[in-house]
Amino acid sequence: MQVTETLNEGLKREIKVVVPAGDLEAKLAERLETARGRARINGFRPGKVPTAHLRKMYGKSFMAEIVNEILNDLSRSILAERNEKSATQPEVIMSEDEKEAEKVLDGKADFVFSLNYEVLPAIEVKDFSKIAVTREVVDISDEEVDEQVKRIASSTRTFETKKGKAENEDRVTIDYLGKLDGEPFEGGADNDAQLVLGSGQFIPGFEEQLIGLKAGDEKVITVTFPAEYGAAHLAGKEATFDIKVKEVAKPNELVLDDETAKKLGIESLERLRQVVREQIESQYGQVTRQKVKRQILDALDGDYQFETPQKLVDAEFNNIWQQINFDLQQAGRTFEDEETTEEAAREEYRKLAERRVRLGLVLSEIGEKAGVEVTEEELQRAVYDQVRRYPDQEKEIYDFLRRTPDAVANLRAPIFEEKVVDHLLANINVTDKKVSKEELTAEDEDAASEAKPAKKAAAKKKAAPKKKAEEGKSEEA
């Protein structure tokens, strides 16, 4: 067998392999001899089937198996002998000449093929102990906890029908029909919708115009959808809503006690406060970690500059680009609406893909050198979390994960990355800084999540006047 390197440029490699016909023939002879003892063919005693007859019956199928085994085994062994790691599965290039392929299967021609691949770059882990990051910390006040407890407990609040005019904090039950230029628009109507005035549930200007109405009243109100509204065909547009008030109800006093907590499934008010505080701490902690992680990645980005495997970059870019176009389509927007062009966006996200790949390789090398591993328990927990996202499809998801090693690898990767970040945090300079919750959560274009750094168009929502339809703000790296 001849193995010849025919390309060595940067990370690109091409290896030409020639397996002599004689070697193939020898492997085939071994396989035919093994088959002779097992074959049961009419007219022949066991173990007495002539080799020529076996070759006629099984020769090509056996040779095809031999060729596939050679491809699988040599791809691994060649990389191991060269002490190289392929960034992706090596591409096998063979002759497309059918006559040539027939000769190989008949044992009359050498088996010639090439392996094309990109090697993972050699990365020397640098001293990261001098990396310095600021960890923003928020002190959670009792007032904030109580405010959140009250907000949660308000779902247990009861209302009592009243005859007077609707006031702030009253609950109104209404039918509404939204119109643009006098024509009803999709998703702009609802019956028996319940709205607590002053809750901010609907878009600005809607709730205020219902104050003072009584049950049985009808009114046409005019509102303007926010410019950043999720449904692009409504964003910034003036619309009218035909309103019919069916009931006005006043809120009963909200009592915060153990009974209220029990209605929420918590044993006591004190335990409810504790749960709420833990939730707030977790929410702020996630934001803090993302900001710290971004600082670490930015520092590593400045320390490591090297050529990245283009196939990995291509795959990452395609994932990003597919998501970007899906988001734009869902929102009914274009690149021009985002104040850019497709060409400029491609360039931006190509750079982003290259950064992601490079940092991924750096984190992988740091983790490997540090002995970071993902335990089976951690992986099983990730599998369980994944399955929980698809209720009533548990069996299908489990079967898919069993059949698809890459899917399991995709679950393992983020766990590994977070453990590497933990390792870095334990070995770099971290300075805590007390900030307000407003400072912590303030939008920062350069501090968006590295896991999802692509700027996303707002998702299309039901075209109702509900304020929550505005959600889906953009993110960018």
UniProtKB/Swiss-Prot annotation:
Residues 169-254 form the PPIase FKBP-type domain. Residues 454-466 have a biased composition (Basic residues). The keyword Transmembrane does not apply. Keywords: Cell cycle, Cell division, Chaperone, Cytoplasm, Isomerase, Rotamase. One of its GO terms (biological process) is 'de novo' cotranslational protein folding. InterPro entries: PPIase_dom_sf, PPIase_FKBP_dom, Trig_fac, Trigger_fac_C, Trigger_fac_C_sf, Trigger_fac_ribosome-bd_bac, Trigger_fac_ribosome-bd_sf, Trigger_fact/SurA_dom_sf. It is found in: Cytoplasm. GO terms for cellular component: cytoplasm. It is an enzyme of class 5 (isomerase). Its EC number is 5.2.1.8. PROSITE patterns: FKBP_PPIASE (PS50059). Pfam families: FKBP_C, Trigger_C, Trigger_N. Consists of 3 domains; the N-terminus binds the ribosome, the middle domain has PPIase activity, while the C-terminus has intrinsic chaperone activity on its own. NCBIfam families: tig (TIGR00115). Belongs to the FKBP-type PPIase family. Tig subfamily. Involved in protein export. Acts as a chaperone by maintaining the newly synthesized protein in an open conformation. Functions as a peptidyl-prolyl cis-trans isomerase. PANTHER family: TRIGGER FACTOR CHAPERONE AND PEPTIDYL-PROLYL CIS/TRANS ISOMERASE (PTHR30560), TRIGGER FACTOR-LIKE PROTEIN TIG, CHLOROPLASTIC (PTHR30560:SF3). This is Trigger factor. It comes from Brucella suis biovar 1 (strain 1330). The gene is tig.
